[in-house]
């Protein structure tokens, strides 16, 4: 387990009494804060990033701490705000698989020609399905891919509201799934 952790301050604290609770946390308190974040965020790397940001925000704003609550409660409030911001950011830019992930999979199957043939057939079905989409959906899909999936940049490029981009992409996904695999 982690030993008791004391965050050292190399500068003079603004109020010596106000920073004591925030700057001195035990391993149990840090673990409780980590558990608070883990309940809401499942990705371990994101949990670590958010936890680190909580401490940075707390140190940056320690002069605003009023002692109306426990330092742990104040830190949980900061964590909750950062978690909300994290999910807002994720909503604006959806997850996309990288092509590098496919390279590793292809290397594992390099001796199996049937896998390559199936991949080419599936790619052909996807291209055919995209060609069957209405022009406005094709354009939104194309620009979205060029903008790395960023809805706002796609909307700005096309000169349409962000809601229109989301709607067209959603309908395009549904149509593509139905055309590629009607039994799914």
Swiss-Prot record:
A motif (Polymerase core binding) lies at residues 49-62. It holds the Pfam family Sigma70_r2. Residues 151-170 bind DNA. It comes from the Bacteria. The gene is hrpL. One of its GO terms (biological process) is symbiont-mediated perturbation of host programmed cell death. The keyword Transcription regulation applies. The keyword Transcription applies. Gene3D superfamilies: 1.10.1740.10, Winged helix-like DNA-binding domain superfamily/Winged helix DNA-binding domain. It comes from Pseudomonas syringae pv. syringae. This is RNA polymerase sigma factor HrpL. Belongs to the sigma-70 factor family. ECF subfamily. One of its GO terms (molecular function) is sigma factor activity. Keywords: DNA-binding, Hypersensitive response elicitation, Sigma factor, Transcription, Transcription regulation. Sigma factors are initiation factors that promote the attachment of RNA polymerase to specific initiation sites and are then released. This sigma factor is involved in the activation of hprD as well as other hrp loci which are involved in plant pathogenicity, hrmA and avr genes.
């Amino acid at each position: 387990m982690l030993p008791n952790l004391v965050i050292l301050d190399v500068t003079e604290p603004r109020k010596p009494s106000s920073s004591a609770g925030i700057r001195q946390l035990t391993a149990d308190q840090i673990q409780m804060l980590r558990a608070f974040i883990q309940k809401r965020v499942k990705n371990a790397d994101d949990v670590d990033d958010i936890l680190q940001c909580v401490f940075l925000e707390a140190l940056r704003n320690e002069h605003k701490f009023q002692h109306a609550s426990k330092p742990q409660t104040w830190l949980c409030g900061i964590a909750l705000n950062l978690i909300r911001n994290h999910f807002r950011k994720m909503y604006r830019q959806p997850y996309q698989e990288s092509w590098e992930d496919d390279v590793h999979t292809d290397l594992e199957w390099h001796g199996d020609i049937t896998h390559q043939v199936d991949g080419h057939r599936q790619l052909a079905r996807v291209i055919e399905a995209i060609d069957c989409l209405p022009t406005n959906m094709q354009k939104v899909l194309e620009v979205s891919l060029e903008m790395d999936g960023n809805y706002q940049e796609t909307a700005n490029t096309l000169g349409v509201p962000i809601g229109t981009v989301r709607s067209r992409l959603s309908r395009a996904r549904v149509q593509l799934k139905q055309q590629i695999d009607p039994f799914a």
